[in-house]
Structure formats: structure tokens, C-alpha cells
Swiss-Prot record:
Chief site of localization: mitochondrion
Annotated signal sequence range: none
Domain of life: Eukaryota
Cellular localisation: Mitochondrion
InterPro entries per the UniProt record, alphabetical: Gta3_dom
Key word Cell membrane present: no
GO cellular component, one term: glutamyl-tRNA(Gln) amidotransferase complex
Official protein name in the record: Uncharacterized protein C777.11
Keywords attached to this entry: Mitochondrion
Organism: Schizosaccharomyces pombe (strain 972 / ATCC 24843)
Length: 128
């Protein structure tokens, strides 16, 4: 893969630089070609994107330097297989719609919210 070879604008050098070097317009153009995107029409938009990329790379390097030795299980995954048959189909979505079902049950949050809404609608517009 040519973009991983050590060169001035390689992805590997950009992401693994120690300390990380800021991405410039040349590196940004290289990354855009790498992922198949076009540059933005305005120079300001490109500069904002480059700034965000540089901030993200700096944060990534900071996270890599954190001491995580105290974490016993850093990545938890599902320990059981998912049965695709048990997932809801389109006509069967209603039991899975949490907010709609909570409104139907008229739980405490929704009861208080609806009471506040009713009280505010009873006030006259001239009342201060």
C-alpha cells in the first residue's frame, strides 16, 4: 500500500508522528485523495477541517499515552450470539419504541411534563 510507505505525506507518518506534526494543505490533499473525497469550495472550510483533524490527532496521541494498566477488561463485548429472528421487523416495532410507549403508560416524567404544558396553556397572554 503506497500510502503506508514512509514519505513526507504518508498516512502512517501523519498518524504515528511522535510528537504529532500538524497536518498542512499537502497532507490534507493526500488524505482526501486516499479516501476519495473532494476538497471544500472555500478555503475557510478546508482550514476548519484541517484544524479539527489536527486536534483529533493530538487527542489520539494523548489517549495513547494514558496509563490504562488499572483497567482489567478494557473492551467488553457481547458474550452471547444475537438471534436475528428475535429482532423486531417493521410491523413489529411498536414494543421497541421506548418514548412512545412511555407516553402511552403516562409515566411520572410524562405526567409532570403534560401537566406543566396544560398549566402554561391555561394562562392568558395578557397576564405578566
Amino acid at each position: 500500500m503506497p500510502f503506508l510507505k514512509p514519505s513526507k505525506v504518508s498516512l502512517k507518518r501523519i498518524l504515528q508522528g511522535n510528537p504529532p506534526k500538524p497536518i498542512g494543505l499537502t497532507e490534507y490533499g493526500h488524505l482526501l485523495r486516499l479516501v476519495g473525497l473532494r476538497e471544500a469550495d472555500s478555503k475557510e472550510e478546508n482550514e476548519r477541517t484541517i484544524l479539527k483533524l489536527n486536534e483529533g490527532i493530538i487527542q489520539m496521541h494523548a489517549i495513547e499515552r494514558l496509563d490504562t494498566s488499572f483497567i482489567k477488561e478494557p473492551f467488553r463485548t457481547l458474550n452471547h450470539a444475537i438471534n436475528a429472528e428475535s429482532l423486531p421487523s417493521l410491523p413489529d416495532q411498536e414494543p421497541w419504541n421506548v418514548f412512545q410507549n412511555a407516553k402511552k403508560r403516562d409515566g411520572q416524567y410524562f405526567a409532570v411534563y403534560s401537566k406543566l404544558k396544560d398549566d402554561s396553556s391555561n394562562e392568558s397572554p395578557n397576564k405578566q
